């Protein structure tokens, strides 16, 4: 397998480490670096934990590049049993066949059999998936007993160092969460609705950052940005602004509105935030028309990111009216046939299912029909087309409702922050 120079460099930098983190920007080929490191470590038994949508991609990668390695899909109970049996019978014996078991984050904590295994290599693809140390997946993974660890991520914490602790723990940095937070994060006490809680200082969120990065490198972390390795094409962001609807204004004022026969009740911060976003999406006929106009203006491939199923339905109807071939990636379907074969295809991608991992560089035009509220998903969505092999300027069309919550969401995402309930409540106070 032929590696790029930056991939060889990453492996060379971690030559003496058995626990490593490859924080390589999207498109720099973390898959190849991670799999090659796994082979170099030479464990008989290996486990890869990834997103559900990436299982088949990982299986294909090993079959294509490492045909002698035996691959198991651990989402299948029989294959899981065979994988465990093979480890019990052969691991550690000379001549044992190298095995790789692949499973997704949402299922791994339900496979208690994996806690029996020892002396294996554990690889986490998109290791930022374990940034919440109270989540079931994270607790389970931290209980596993690997000898070797490989972490792969393009945006390990979306620029938020407070969420790094669980990953550093896996790399062998024995620092308590409390001490980590004291040394590297600036927390401030705030009172809200009579309750005291701590938030990160907006002006100066972190401290001792140089020391933190040095400690991370000391524990096998490698950081690489795309611009350090390749000259990629320019990225151009084009806002497409449409007016708010009267229903949006009514809902923002009263917290209640009926639209298209559906009553939207904002009786909590969560529902207010959710419905405010929806009213800027498929409920906004001006935005749907603007999307139709945009799609009509080009016969090039379009990649369209959306949030909700109702948005998918509306976008599919428009694509069908325009007689455009449709591909889609969401929690139920991953069909890229039209994208692969039709130059005028429209590919509809739900953020949660497709913002990470997909290579969509045949296209150079991306439409954000609505915005995600997660910084990491926004950054990774942009990288689906802006990656190694892309030789065209990348255009990103940001469809925005003027003077709405969407403008605040975009401002927040551009600061590499999530748009949280707390920020929405602040937006509500500022809007009064």
Regions found by a protein language model. Give the residues of each.
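A conserved SF2-helicase RecA2
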Residues: 373-432
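Conserved helicase/translocase motor-coupling segment
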Residues: 227-321
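Conserved P-loop NTPase motor "coupling/switch" region that bridges the ATPase
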Residues: 45, 68, 81, 85, ...
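Conserved helix-turn-beta segment of the N-terminal RecA-like "Helicase ATP-binding" lobe
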Residues: 54-78, 171-175, 323
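Walker A/P-loop
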Residues: 17-37
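Conserved pre-motif I regulatory segment
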Residues: 1-23
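Conserved Walker A/P-loop ATP-binding site and its immediately adjacent core
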Residues: 33, 43-64, 159-163, 307-310
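Conserved helicase ATPase core of P-loop NTP-dependent helicases/translocases
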Residues: 84-87, 303-305, 313-316, 320-354
């Amino acid at each position: 397998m032929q590696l790029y120079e930056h991939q060889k460099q990453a492996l060379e930098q971690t030559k003496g480490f058995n626990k490593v983190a490859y924080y390589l920007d999207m498109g720099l080929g973390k898959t190849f670096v991670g799999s090659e490191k796994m082979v170099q470590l030479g464990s008989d038994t290996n486990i890869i934990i990834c997103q559900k949508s990436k299982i088949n991609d990982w299986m294909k990668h090993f079959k294509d590049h490492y045909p002698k390695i035996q691959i198991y899909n651990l989402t299948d109970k029989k294959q899981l049993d065979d994988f465990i049996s093979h480890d019990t019978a052969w691991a550690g014996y000379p001549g044992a066949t190298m095995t790789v078991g692949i499973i997704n984050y949402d299922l791994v904590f339900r496979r208690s059999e994996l806690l029996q295994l020892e002396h294996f290599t554990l690889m986490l693809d998109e290791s930022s998936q374990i940034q919440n140390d109270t989540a079931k997946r994270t607790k389970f993974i931290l209980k596993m007993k690997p000898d070797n660890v490989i972490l792969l991520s393009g945006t390990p914490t979306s620029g938020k160092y407070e969420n790094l602790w669980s990953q550093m723990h896996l790399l062998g940095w024995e620092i308590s969460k409390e001490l980590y937070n004291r040394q590297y994060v600036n927390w401030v006490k705030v009172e809200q609705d009579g309750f005291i809680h701590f938030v990160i200082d907006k002006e100066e969120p972190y401290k001792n950052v140089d020391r933190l990065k040095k400690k991370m490198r000391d524990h096998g972390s490698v950081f690489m940005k795309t611009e350090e390795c390749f000259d990629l094409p320019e990225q151009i962001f084009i806002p497409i602004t449409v007016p708010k609807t009267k229903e949006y204004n009514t809902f923002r004022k009263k917290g209640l509105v009926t639209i298209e026969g559906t009553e939207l009740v904002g009786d909590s911060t969560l529902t207010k935030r959710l419905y405010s976003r929806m009213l800027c999406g498929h409920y906004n006929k001006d935005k749907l028309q603007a999307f139709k106009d945009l799609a009509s203006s080009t016969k090039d491939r379009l990649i369209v990111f959306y949030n909700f199923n109702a948005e998918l339905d509306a976008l599919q109807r428009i694509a069908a009216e325009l007689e455009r071939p449709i591909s889609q990636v969401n929690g139920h379907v991953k069909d890229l046939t039209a994208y692969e074969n039709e130059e005028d295809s429209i590919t509809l991608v739900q953020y949660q299912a497709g913002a990470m991992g997909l290579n969509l560089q045949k296209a150079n035009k991306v439409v954000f029909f609505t915005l995600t509220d997660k910084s990491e998903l926004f950054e990774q969505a942009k990288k689906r087309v802006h990656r190694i092999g892309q030789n065209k300027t990348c255009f990103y069309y940001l469809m925005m409702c003027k003077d709405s919550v969407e403008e605040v969401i975009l401002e927040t995402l551009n600061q590499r922050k999530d748009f949280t309930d707390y920020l929405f409540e602040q937006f509500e106070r500022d809007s009064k």
